[in-house]
Amino acid sequence: MKIERKPSTALLPTPVVLLSVAGHGKEKDNIITLAWVGTVCSAPPMLSVAIRPSRHSHRLVDAAREFVVNIPRAGQLEAVDLAGVWSGAEHDKFAELGFTARPAKQVAAPLIEECPINIECVVRHQLALGAHDLYLAEIVATHYDEELLDSRGRLKTAELDAMAYVDGEYWSLGERLGSHGAAAKAAGRKG
């Protein structure tokens, strides 16, 4: 039996990322933890991030029009959680959370050295949706820790140790279940 509830954000899980953005004027570079992030286009490669207008980082992204999406490891949970709770208006999150800012190649926002994947982005569109603004951003550079790539340059996902966000809780990712298209191939069918 199904139980109907009021409309909610029940699309689960969502990734856990650290978005870094360059400071504006006298403000320091900042980090915000986000879970409402997703791939939206493959050519050109684009992603989306949703940020509440009340957040300090929202103002910085509006000014900079670029940012870096950094993928943290599960072992960084405490710093990840604090980056999402503390305000950059009151905390120097890079210094206080022990993160190292490294220059990006294409944008002014810094990479977080301790994160194994860094995705440089330039905002192409912004939509005011209600509680959140949605930024659609083109990916202009992607960086991987070398040990995460196999000899063919493919991601060794099992070694990434990424996190997911589900209903107010952080979760680790489980085991590999299969590959895209494997069921159709096994059944002798094509799309």
Language-model-detected regions and their locations in the chain:
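Basic, polyanion-binding surface patches
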Residues: M1-G191
